[in-house]
């Protein structure tokens, strides 16, 4: 079993890379891919860069060059659930674009043309993540809708507009749906795991800078615990 792991920023992958053994590095199109062993599994970890285009490029290269059995997207997100605190975790129950609108042609809000409205993570990856939750200590984790767009959300007016379109949204970020869409195209199982760095409000820019390292660590810890729970035979 080989698992691809994608984070957008250095703090989101640093703890994973530091914990790897037998690591080798290859750079393609300016993106570094680090292959090795983590939590007893063969993995390839990459820092994609921020946003949907960067994430799509990295995911496509990862799948084409390394043929992973599954892809995990790790990192930070803005929170939309009152019961979660900064540092807590959202495991994707589904992933959607929040900044796509082709409703004029009969699609749902957030649904890209000729794509599903929601990208559904692999059941065996979500199951492994839920088993890992018990080992998180004081960090809380839930399953929920994660939405993606090419904007850092810190405007309460925009937040309310997003919640009107996606009332069950638990977190928003800038890469997950793009990664999920590429995985869907290639038929590769995926899951998105995000730790909250802010609460998508006026304080978000300050909170993000203050808590990105904490969020990156918690999300990386969740990924490593998930890897330990994965059954090597549970692929595709």
Swiss-Prot record:
Active site per the UniProt annotation: 12, 198
Keywords carried by this UniProt record: Amino-acid biosynthesis, Hydrolase, Methionine biosynthesis
Cellular component annotations (GO), alphabetically ordered: cytosol
Substrates-to-products reaction catalysed: S-adenosyl-L-homocysteine + H2O = S-(5-deoxy-D-ribos-5-yl)-L-homocysteine + adenine; S-methyl-5'-thioadenosine + H2O = 5-(methylsulfanyl)-D-ribose + adenine; 5'-deoxyadenosine + H2O = 5-deoxy-D-ribose + adenine
Keyword flag Zinc: no
A Pfam family the protein falls into: PNP_UDP_1
Pathway assigned to this chain's UniProt record: Amino-acid biosynthesis; L-methionine biosynthesis via salvage pathway; S-methyl-5-thio-alpha-D-ribose 1-phosphate from S-methyl-5'-thioadenosine (hydrolase route): step 1/2
Top-rank lineage group of the source organism: Bacteria
InterPro entries the record matches: MTA_SAH_Nsdase, Nucleoside_phosphorylase_d, Nucleoside_phosphorylase_sf
Keyword Transmembrane helix in annotation: no
GO molecular function: adenosylhomocysteine nucleosidase activity; methylthioadenosine nucleosidase activity
EC number(s) from the headed UniProt entry: 3.2.2.9
Record CDD domains: MTAN
PANTHER family linked: 5'-METHYLTHIOADENOSINE/S-ADENOSYLHOMOCYSTEINE NUCLEOSIDASE (PTHR46832), 5'-METHYLTHIOADENOSINE_S-ADENOSYLHOMOCYSTEINE NUCLEOSIDASE (PTHR46832:SF1)
Function statement: Catalyzes the irreversible cleavage of the glycosidic bond in both 5'-methylthioadenosine (MTA) and S-adenosylhomocysteine (SAH/AdoHcy) to adenine and the corresponding thioribose, 5'-methylthioribose and S-ribosylhomocysteine, respectively. Also cleaves 5'-deoxyadenosine, a toxic by-product of radical S-adenosylmethionine (SAM) enzymes, into 5-deoxyribose and adenine.
Similarity comment: Belongs to the PNP/UDP phosphorylase family. MtnN subfamily.
Protein name per Swiss-Prot or TrEMBL: 5'-methylthioadenosine/S-adenosylhomocysteine nucleosidase
């Amino acid at each position: 079993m080989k698992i691809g792991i994608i984070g957008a920023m250095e703090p989101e992958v640093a703890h994973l890379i530091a914990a790897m053994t037998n690591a080798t590095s290859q750079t393609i199109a300016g993106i570094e891919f680090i292959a090795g062993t983590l939590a007893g599994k063969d993995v390839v970890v990459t820092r994609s860069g921020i946003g949907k285009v960067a994430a799509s490029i990295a995911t496509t290269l990862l799948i084409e060059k390394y043929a992973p059995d599954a892809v995990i997207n790790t990192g930070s997100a803005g929170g939309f659930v009152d019961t979660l605190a900064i540092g807590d975790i959202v495991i994707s129950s589904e992933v959607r674009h929040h900044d796509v609108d082709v409703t004029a042609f009969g699609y749902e809000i957030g649904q890209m043309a000729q794509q599903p409205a929601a990208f559904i993570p692999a059941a065996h990856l979500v199951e492994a993540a839920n088993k890992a939750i018990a080992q998180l200590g004081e960090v809380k984790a839930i399953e929920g809708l994660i939405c993606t767009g090419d904007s850092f959300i810190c405007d309460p007016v925009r937040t309310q507009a997003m919640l009107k379109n996606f009332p069950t949204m638990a977190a928003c970020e800038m890469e997950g749906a793009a990664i999920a869409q590429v995985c869907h195209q290639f038929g590769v199982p995926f899951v998105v795991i995000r730790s909250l760095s802010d609460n998508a409000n006026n304080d978000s820019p300050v909170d993000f800078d203050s808590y990105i390292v904490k969020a990156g660590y918690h999300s990386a810890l969740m990924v490593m615990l998930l890897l330990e729970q994965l059954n090597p035979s549970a692929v595709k």
